[in-house]
């Protein structure tokens, strides 16, 4: 990455990307059911970090579309790195919450897939 992302590992049960300080905050490993779940959560937040103006500058998206990009991107990262966190029921339930947005504009799915692929490439270092 052109600009490294700061990662804070701390207590609590919530992972998130804080754009104002450009950092990923993630709970300690023991808060997750396994290593794969921990890594998948980190991948999700790493995709969020690519929206920063010093990376892919994706600040024009709605919250729902940004979450869709992050979830799809995390799936791509895990798949490419052979992280077997394919909890498809969890992914499906999470993605299902964005169905109303997709019904209102089906092109959003394809736009989101393209953005998530770019983000995954950046996180992995293939861009």
Model-assigned labels for residue ranges:
Residues 27-30, 55-59, 98, 102:
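Glycine- and acidic
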Residues 34, 38, 42, 87, ...:
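Short, contiguous, pocket-lining structural segments
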Residues 36, 52-71, 87-95:
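Post-HEXXH active-site segment of zinc metalloproteases
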Residues 48, 52-56, 83, 125:
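Conserved helix-loop functional segments at active or binding sites
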Residues 75-127:
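Long, well-structured alpha-helical subdomains associated
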